[in-house]
Amino acid sequence: MTPSLANFLWSLLWGTAIVVIPVTVGLIFISQKDKIQRS
């Protein structure tokens, strides 16, 4: 695997992580908050 290809794959991985992790945390936070408001 060439270094440029490795860098490209790493940047894709980090890009995905940077987008997915906050979204997941946000959804969990919102669902927890909704549960508290409903009960």
Curated annotation (Swiss-Prot):
It is a single-pass membrane protein. Keywords: Membrane, Photosynthesis, Photosystem II, Thylakoid, Transmembrane, Transmembrane helix. Its main location: membrane. The chain crosses the membrane at residues 10-30. InterPro entries: PSII_PsbX, PSII_PsbX_type_1_subfam. One of its GO terms (biological process) is photosynthesis. Gene3D superfamilies: Single helix bin (1.20.5.510). It is found in: Cellular thylakoid membrane. GO terms for cellular component: photosystem II; plasma membrane-derived thylakoid membrane. Involved in the binding and/or turnover of quinones at the Q(B) site of photosystem II (PSII). PSII is a light-driven water plastoquinone oxidoreductase, using light energy to abstract electrons from H(2)O, generating a proton gradient subsequently used for ATP formation. Belongs to the PsbX family. Type 1 subfamily. PSII is composed of 1 copy each of membrane proteins PsbA, PsbB, PsbC, PsbD, PsbE, PsbF, PsbH, PsbI, PsbJ, PsbK, PsbL, PsbM, PsbT, PsbX, PsbY, PsbZ, Psb30/Ycf12, peripheral proteins PsbO, CyanoQ (PsbQ), PsbU, PsbV and a large number of cofactors. It forms dimeric complexes. This is Photosystem II reaction center protein X.
